[in-house]
Amino acid sequence: MASSSTNSPCAACKFLRRKCQPECVFAPYFPPDQPQKFANVHKVFGASNVTKLLNELHPSQREDAVNSLAYEADMRLRDPVYGCVGVISLLQHQLRQLQIDLSCAKSELSKYQSLGILAATHQSLGINLLAGAADGTATAVRDHYHHHQFFPREQMFGGLDVPAGNNYDGGILAIGQITQFQQPRAAAGDDGRRTVDPS
């Protein structure tokens, strides 16, 4: 930024054809190499109005104010009817359109996420059903095996007089009765098959 110490007037003082004083309010914000910036501001707002505005502001706020005035002046010269309002309206319209597009994209994404969750649920359900069927088959086979392996006491000994209890002597006695029961049948079978000598 230019100052009076450079012996070169600021763009405002040069445009107004006056001597740039050390306390010039325009010097920090309108350097000599940006004459068009002040020309536009002066044409739209007037140098006196800008001077009054800057004097009422705190020095820390003046730079932002000058940049805003310069932008508004440039837009007003480009579009005398709407000025910067036309640009703001266009940007707002673009923002609304982008928000609509974003909402649609989120809706589509939610649909795909729901389909993914549903597919995963169906897959998990199918795996559980297969596992349940396999467990049921294994249980049926196990029950069938136990049914044929372990018979009731009455079915095993066929009504024989077997002493009650699980002692060893009772088991031996039962086996002896079965053996005695089978031997006469075998003998009778042998007699039935014996051939008679015709002589």
Curated annotation (Swiss-Prot):
Disruption phenotype: Plants are indistinguishable from that of wild-type at 16 degrees Celsius, however they generate a weak phenotype of pointed leaves at 22 degrees Celsius which become narrower at 26 degrees Celsius. In the leaves of plants grown at 26 degrees Celsius, the xylems are located on the adaxial sides and the phloems are on the abaxial sides, similar to those in the wild-type. Plants with double mutations in this protein and in RH10 or AS1 protein have abaxialized filamentous and trumpet-like leaves with loss of the adaxial domain at high temperatures.
One GO CC annotation: nucleoplasm
UniProt note on tissues of expression: Expressed in young shoots, roots, stems, leaves, flowers and adaxial domains of cotyledonary and leaves primordia.
UniProtKB keywords: Developmental protein, Nucleus, Repressor, Stress response
Induction, per UniProt: Negatively regulated by SHOOT MERISTEMLESS (STM).
PROSITE patterns: LOB (PS50891)
Top-level division of the source organism's lineage: Eukaryota
Residue span(s) of domain LOB: 8-109
Chain ranges passing through the membrane: none
Localization of this protein: Nucleus
Protein's GO biological process: adaxial/abaxial axis specification; petal development; polarity specification of adaxial/abaxial axis; proximal/distal pattern formation; specification of symmetry
Stored Pfam families: LOB (PF03195)
InterPro entries named in the record: LOB
Family of this protein: Belongs to the LOB domain-containing protein family.
Note: Gain-of-function mutants iso1-D and iso-2D (T-DNA tagging) show completely curled up hyponastic rosette leaves.
Subunit structure: Homo- and heterodimer with AS1. Interacts with AS1. Part of the AS1 repressor complex composed of AS1, LBD6/AS2 and HDA6. Interacts with LFR.
Protein's job: Negative regulator of cell proliferation in the adaxial side of leaves. Regulates the formation of a symmetric lamina and the establishment of venation. Positively regulates LATERAL ORGAN BOUNDARIES (LOB) within the shoot apex, and the class III HD-ZIP genes REV, PHB, and PHV. Interacts directly with ASYMMETRIC LEAVES 1 (AS1) to repress the knox homeobox genes KNAT1, KNAT2, and KNAT6 and the abaxial determinants ARF3, KAN2 and YAB5. May act in parallel with the RDR6-SGS3-AGO7 pathway, an endogenous RNA silencing pathway, to regulate the leaf morphogenesis.
Protein name: Protein ASYMMETRIC LEAVES 2
Species annotation: Arabidopsis thaliana
Name of the coding gene: AS2
